[in-house]
Curated annotation (Swiss-Prot):
Pathways per UniProt: One-carbon metabolism; tetrahydrofolate interconversion
Homology family: Belongs to the formate--tetrahydrofolate ligase family.
Uppermost EC category: ligase
EC numbers on record: 6.3.4.3
GO molecular function: ATP binding; formate-tetrahydrofolate ligase activity
InterPro entries assigned: Formate_THF_ligase, Formate_THF_ligase_CS, P-loop_NTPase
GO biological process terms on file: tetrahydrofolate interconversion
Record-linked Gene3D superfamilies: Domain 2, N(10)-formyltetrahydrofolate synthetase, Formyltetrahydrofolate synthetase, domain 3, P-loop containing nucleotide triphosphate hydrolases
NCBIfam families hit by this protein: PRK13505.1
Organism: Thermotoga maritima (strain ATCC 43589 / DSM 3109 / JCM 10099 / NBRC 100826 / MSB8)
Protein name as catalogued: Formate--tetrahydrofolate ligase
Catalytic activity, as annotated: (6S)-5,6,7,8-tetrahydrofolate + formate + ATP = (6R)-10-formyltetrahydrofolate + ADP + phosphate
Pfam families reported in the protein's UniProt record: FTHFS (PF01268)
Length: 542
């Protein structure tokens, strides 16, 4: 690894805006972005993927490798990524810093505590929870209805036992007993707000708008009513600054914030993306989950807030993922199966069609694995060419930037200025926005709203939230809301079970299916593979 000062020098960053965290990590003062206003924006490349499978598609690995490969062919590039969540790192998923010869470094530190941003978000979130219950205990001047408190508690850990709890037990000295729950930190609205805020003023204004409860008269109670947004911003003072690290080939990477891609927008901070666009020719950024969730939200929501628009989309696919979506069993996923591949290619086709609805040039990155056969690779390449999309076989995991040169050249050729094309207008009613997304992206035949959802729509209209963008929270395992429907389901009924407003983040969340905001650990969590020796060397994290 190179000292972080050398990485900063590549970007001509001065010492007075850098806050080093050891030898290989530094924060960049978020106010530095203001000084870059007159710099021309580079091109923005959005990396997304086909519908995720249990085996993983290598989207983060591809994002990192693409940025390294662009640098290799003489195109100055920065990759911007979300911060990993500690819970999934210790649980089923493991680390989230890429793999093989295409990683961000120092991987162990990034995957674990990093610069403390997750801790800061959790602290700000839980400060509000504590102040809220303290207010209720000490007279409840705001007349908060304790049966209608929306704000949960949070921790950055997978712990299913905390999904439903009762607090305030043990007598009046401990407050009023009520039901509560914990969510994982990545699902906190504070995390979404941090990722969307462009400066401290914006951050405090957004925090103040958060809806925490209803009062006895069914009126909204916000953080600004409690007056705690300033203290929350104090706890986030350093977390608002993007984190500078490096790739395995010593090229720059910005890693900042980590909002969920279902309950929120699922991408790194707007500050980091805009800063990277000012400092490079090509910014490579990643959207969470598949293109139906992450890419749609990036374009319809994040791009509008940030004032930018992608110049091209990279759709990551693997032969094994397409075979899985074609009905192949995971146990036999590494065996050649052209029939399953043919059927599963329909999933890729849907995502290509969807991305084209946003006016985006699409490049398919076929992430190659050692078990892929030449016939399978040739089939995918041929079918992509029939669709009229560029396709490049990527081997960045095995070969680093050398394995991504073909992909980098294809992306550089494809990237262009495009006319933004959003799926819905902001003044469309919320239910119309949902119907557009369900039919255009998820390929549903019709949309059905539960009675709970219908009541939520009335609340949204009554309080003036109807013109907010919509974030759909559904399973990432299918284009539909049903995780059992692989491939390219269509014509089904898309069911909206509930809606709620993230007023500080600035969107309405539409829930479809079972969405769990506090994951649990598997029988054998990844934590069992981890250890540290007497010299401080860590094993089993990434």
């Amino acid at each position: 690894m190179k000292p972080i000062k050398e990485i900063a020098d590549q970007l001509e960053l001065k010492d007075d805006i850098l806050y080093p965290y050891g030898h290989y990590i530094a924060k960049i003062d978020h106010r530095f972005l203001k000084s870059l206003e007159n710099h021309e924006d580079g091109k923005l490349i959005l990396v997304t993927a086909v519908t995720p499978t249990p085996a993983g598609e290598g989207k983060t690995t591809t994002s990192i490798g693409l940025s390294m490969s662009l640098n290799r062919i003489g195109k100055k590039s920065i990759v911007t990524l979300r911060e990993p969540s500690l819970g999934p790192t210790l649980g089923l998923k493991g680390g989230a810093t890429g793999g093989g010869r295409s990683r961000v470094l120092p991987s162990d530190e990034i995957n674990l505590h990093f610069t403390g941003d997750m801790h800061a978000v959790a602290s700000a979130h839980n400060l509000l929870a504590a102040v809220l219950d303290s207010h209720i205990k000490h007279g409840n001047e705001l007349k908060i209805d304790i049966t209608r408190v929306f704000w949960k508690r949070t921790m950055d850990m997978n712990d299913r036992a905390l999904r439903s709890i009762v607090i305030g037990l043990g007598g009046s000295a401990n407050g009023f007993p009520r039901e509560d729950s914990f969510i994982i930190t990545a699902a906190s609205e504070v995390m979404a707000i941090l990722a969307l805020s462009e400066n401290m003023k914006d951050l405090k204004e957004r925090l103040g708008k958060i809806i925490v409860a209803l009062d006895a008269d069914r009126k909204i109670v916000r953080i600004s009513d409690l007056g705690i947004q300033g203290a929350m911003a104090v706890l986030l003072k350093d977390a608002i600054n993007p984190n500078l690290v490096q790739t395995t080939e010593g090229t720059p990477a910005l890693i900042h914030c980590g909002p969920f891609a279902n309950i929120a927008h699922g991408t790194n901070s707007i500050i980091a993306t805009k800063m990277a666009m000012k400092l490079s020719e090509y910014t490579v950024t990643e959207a969470g989950f598949g293109a139906d969730l992450g890419a749609e939200k990036f374009i319809d929501f994040v791009s509008r807030v940030g004032g930018f628009y992608p110049n091209a989309a990279v759709l990551v696919a693997t032969v094994r993922a397409l075979k899985y979506h074609g009905g192949a069993n995971l146990k036999n996923i590494h065996e050649e199966n052209l029939e399953a591949l043919k059927e599963g290619f329909k999933n890729l086709r849907v995502h290509v069609e969807n991305l084209r609805k946003f006016n985006l040039p699409v490049v398919v990155a076929l992430n190659r694995f050692s078990t892929d056969t030449e016939k399978e690779i040739a089939y995918v390449v041929k079918e992509c060419e029939k669709l009229g999309v560029r396709v490049a076989v990527s081997e960045v995991f095995k070969k680093g930037s050398e394995g991504g040169v073909e992909l980098a050249k294809a992306v550089a050729e494809a990237a262009k200025d495009v006319e933004p094309a959003y799926l819905y207008e902001m003044n469309d009613p919320v239910e119309k926005k949902i119907e557009i997304l369900a039919k255009e992206i998820y390929r549903a035949g019709r949309v059905e709203f539960s009675d709970t959802a219908k009541n939520a729509l009335k609340f949204i209209k009554k309080h003036g939230f109807d013109e907010l963008p919509v974030i759909v929270a559904k399973t990432p395992k299918s284009i539909s809301h049903d995780p059992s429907l692989r491939g390219a389901p269509e014509g089904y009924t898309f069911v909206v079970s509930d809606l709620f407003v993230s007023a500080g983040a600035g969107f309405v969340v539409a829930l479809s299916g079972d969405i769990n905001l506090m994951p649990g650990l598997p029988k054998k969590p990844n934590a069992l593979n981890m250890d540290v020796d007497d010299s401080g060397n860590i094993v089993g994290v990434s």
